A protein has these predicted regions:
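Glycine-rich phosphate/cofactor-binding loops in nucleotide/flavin-utilizing enzymes
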Residues: 2-5, 297-349
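Short glycine/serine- and small hydrophobic-enriched flexible loop segments
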Residues: 69-76, 93-99, 223-227, 267, ...
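Amphipathic, small/basic residue-rich leader segments at the start of a protein or domain
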Residues: 1-84, 335-349
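C-terminal helix-coil-helix/basic helical segment that borders enzyme active sites and/or dimer interfaces
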Residues: 24-34, 229, 233, 237-240, ...
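N-terminal glycine-rich flavin-associated loop
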Residues: 82-100
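FAD-binding core of flavoproteins
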Residues: 105-226, 340-349
Length: 349
């Protein structure tokens, strides 16, 4: 598998090689909870499921660049798992910093439980206090689990953790991202069962989500570009491989440029505003590269026997799952140093 990003140091290269040996097993995920759980458990056993969380919380303590490499490699084969891992990272950051949910944090590290992380004021989130009961709905969560916990980032410094028992979940159809086990969620949670996590760095959690989304999108773009180049090298037309045609080579170069752009912005992101920009750019790059890769396969690009059409569907669904437009308001406020007002959900009855 091609690495389209900056030169890797030996530790990063070893991690990429290890994950390549795992992801090249040609395991195509479906919405089968047993196979998903098996892969998550394997990633957890390898220490990469929560690689970027702090050692004090039980994680791998890897820096952002090492985590970026891991997520990009995982997303080449299983982007739904990469996105689920990103949400687990963000949730552990929040919960461990506040000393909340110690048992849940341990289970998240081991892949035994899952969590969906959403923004309280996102367009697909509709939650409000009704007396002592938190009610409402989230139209989409993608946690690679049938019954995840729900962590709601509510304004600055506050998050709410909701148990699976207080959630009614229903399957949701989507374009791609197989293995995400996408669900809609109806919430009816008594105040006493909602864990209010206060005094935490929710801006850092948002940056973690967006930065991880960018790395996942870069993985999709890289896989699509590699697939198109491989097909063009093997497919013979007019007496030789397609790569002998200058226009084909230029198209492949454009795809590689898009993959390189995606990983470059993911690699460089740090703050909430820069991570928002990275996620937006990388998700768009992934869709563009994957769409071009389908065209590079000709009519075969639309057949499920080839991965090209799956990469395009995955890119589209990841961009929808990340909800880039909803994060732009807070990223803009963070950019200019504006402190948002206390979110209504943070004002518990």
């Amino acid at each position: 598998m091609t690495w389209f990003g900056p030169r890797l140091d030996p530790d990063h290269a070893d991690l990429a090689a290890m994950l390549d040996s795992l992801t090249t097993k040609d395991i195509v995920l479906e919405d089968d909870s047993t196979s998903i759980r098996r892969l998550v458990t394997e990633l957890a056993a390898l220490g990469v499921w929560t690689l970027g969380t702090t050692e004090t919380s039980g994680g791998g303590g890897a820096d952002d660049t090492m985590t970026c490499v891991a997520l990009e490699r995982i997303a080449r084969a299983w982007p739904a798992l990469a996105w689920a891992s990103v949400q687990v990272h963000a949730a552990i950051d929040v919960l461990a910093a506040a000393g909340a949910g110690a048992g849940l944090v341990e289970d998240l590290h081991q892949g035994r439980r899952a969590v969906a992380v959403v923004e309280a004021d996102a367009a697909h989130v509709n939650l409000a206090w009704d007396g002592d009961v938190l009610r409402g709905s989230v139209s989409r969560v993608d946690a690679a689990h049938e019954r995840p916990h729900l962590l709601v980032l509510a304004g600055t410094g506050t998050a709410l953790l909701i148990r699976p028992d207080d959630l009614d979940v229903q399957p949701v159809s989507r374009t791609g991202l197989a293995g995400a086990l996408t669900r809609s969620v109806t919430v009816a949670a008594d105040r006493r069962s909602v864990v209010l996590v206060d005094g935490v760095d929710t801006s850092a959690a948002r940056a973690r989500l967006l930065r991880g989304a960018a790395a996942g999108a870069a993985g999709i773009a890289g896989a699509a570009a590699d697939g198109a180049r491989r097909y063009a090298s093997e497919r013979r037309q007019f007496g030789g491989p397609l790569t002998e045609i200058p226009m084909v080579r230029q198209t492949l170069l454009d795809q590689s440029n898009g993959a390189a752009s995606a990983i470059a912005v993911a690699w460089a992101a740090s703050s909430e505003p820069s991570s928002h920009a990275a996620a937006r750019r990388a998700c768009d790059d992934a869709v563009d590269v994957a769409a071009s890769a389908v065209q590079s396969h000709g009519g075969y690009g639309y057949l499920t026997e080839y991965a090209a059409e799956r990469h395009l569907r995955d890119a589209i669904s990841l961009r929808a799952a990340v909800a880039i437009p909803s994060s732009s308001i807070r990223a803009g406020a963070a950019l200019v140093g504006t402190r948002p007002a206390t979110h209504p959900l943070a004002r518990t009855p």
